[in-house]
A protein has these predicted regions:
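N-terminal phosphate/diphosphate-binding loop that engages ATP/GTP or pyrophosphate donors
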Residues: 249-299
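Nucleotide and nucleotide-moiety/phosphate-recognizing core
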Residues: 3-161, 166-170, 176-183, 192-205, ...
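Phosphate/Mg2+-binding loops and adjacent switch elements
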Residues: 318-381
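Glycine-rich phosphate-binding P-loop
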Residues: 232-255
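Extreme N-terminal, non-catalytic leader segments
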Residues: 203, 214-233
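Glycine-rich phosphate-binding loop used to anchor ATP phosphates in small-molecule kinases
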Residues: 296-334
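A charged, well-structured terminal subsegment
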Residues: 177-213, 368-381
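Short, charged/polar "capping" segments at the starts of alpha-helices
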Residues: 60-69, 271-274, 336-340, 353-358
């Protein structure tokens, strides 16, 4: 993204002080691309010349989380520490870390603390769990702004995103009023005074991670973004689950939508030659443009990876019981017990209706269109 001229009185607030009740762990400290979600967002923000950056956090922020910033001072109210950074940048960057004065008030608590100490004409306010927000949409938010409105709210597929939005500094008084009334709804401060812009074409920018499932799905998207070709594995713990039939149906669906699909099959057989009605033959007849059959061997996982990444396709589907690559969809037979949590499986594919889990998404084995849509999400298609 190109660098922009500095816009006076446009500040950035990163909300990193929430309870993360659905995630069950601090979202600002989740591992992300060799750092954390907080560090990732802060580093990404350097592309845009904000007047000041404020992090709302109700914990101690370690120096490694804000690389190259030098501590300048602590404001005597005990809620704020200020930093400055100038190494490797065209202009100095001013950073403040503030804690809430009003506890247990959600995002409004962080917004109040930042706006009270650092008045600014406009604020870009972002939740910390937006790993794909790269600040390229900031000009669009600014262009949509109008003086009589208090906020510019992105809308994705009909859903408002008030924690990835532009606000006027004057909403501070509305925040104080809402807090005094114990009304912690963010919508309260922009209701009837906002411009809504359709950002559906840029939906990935606004993808957030509120749950363990959403976090794994975001990691899958990021992993595939950095591969030569995106990969999704379909696995099963036992034979006879129908995963080959499922894969051929998905290949047929995706091929019908115009995607070039590759297929890699992990097998324990040593013979890998072409054979009528073999799994690779069925995949080819379903529409796969490339197939590979990988037998057992000491470096089988590497062989599967090499075969997948050598294919000139839009997506590779891997069928394997144990050697698939992340992300994985696990096919469960109706009689199977509860699936154990693991870091590589993002969804269960089953006919069962009692598989509600905080660790996995659940897809019905007969809903091929939904399966294909979900696979496209993981593959960034």
């Amino acid at each position: 993204m190109k660098r922009h001229e500095k816009i006076p009185n446009l500040s950035l607030l990163i909300l990193a002080g929430g309870k993360s009740s659905r995630m069950k762990k601090d979202k600002s400290q989740l591992p992300w691309q060799d750092s954390t979600t907080l560090t990732h967002m802060l580093t990404n923000s350097y592309v845009y010349p904000f007047e000041r950056t404020v992090i709302s956090a109700n914990r101690i922020i370690e120096p490694q989380e804000i690389p190259d910033f030098i501590r300048q001072s602590s404001i005597q109210d005990g809620h704020t520490t200020e930093y400055i950074r100038n190494r490797g940048l065209d202009t100095e960057r001013h950073l403040a870390i503030v804690s809430d004065r009003y506890s247990d008030c959600g995002p409004l608590g962080g917004m109040e603390a930042a706006m009270r100490l650092y008045p600014s004409d406009r604020w870009l306010i972002l939740a910390v769990d937006l790993p794909f927000f790269d600040f390229s949409r900031v000009p669009a938010l600014l262009a949509a702004d109008a003086s009589e409105y208090d906020a510019v709210i992105p809308v994705v597929e009909g859903r408002e995103n008030p924690l990835a939005a532009l606000y006027k500094g004057r909403v501070y008084e509305k925040i104080r009023t809402a807090l005094a009334a114990d009304d912690y709804r963010v919508r309260k401060i922009y209701n009837k005074k906002a411009i809504f812009i359709d950002e559906t074409p840029y939906a990935r920018q606004y993808l957030n991670m509120n749950t363990p499932i959403a976090y794994k799905e975001a990691l899958a998207c990021a992993t595939n973004q950095n591969r030569p070709v995106p990969v999704v594995s379909i696995t099963a713990e036992t034979s006879g689950t129908g995963k080959t039939h499922l894969i051929t149906q998905v290949i047929k669906e995706l091929s019908g939508q115009g995607y070039r699909v590759g297929y890699v099959k992990s097998t324990h057989h040593m013979s890998t030659g072409p054979k009528r009605n073999s799994d690779t033959d069925l995949a080819t007849r379903a529409g796969a443009v490339c197939t590979a059959l990988i037998p057992d061997g000491p470096k089988k996982s590497r062989a599967i990876e090499d075969a997948a990444f050598s294919m000139s396709v839009d997506l590779v589907l891997i069928e394997s019981r144990r050697h698939g690559l992340f992300p994985k969809l696990l096919v469960l037979p109706p009689e199977a017990g509860a699936a154990e949590e693991d870091n590589e499986t993002v969804a269960l594919v089953t006919r069962r209706k009692d598989t509600n889990s905080v660790h996995f998404n659940t897809l019905h084995v007969d809903n091929i269109s939904a399966l294909a849509k979900y696979i496209k999400l993981l593959a960034n298609l």
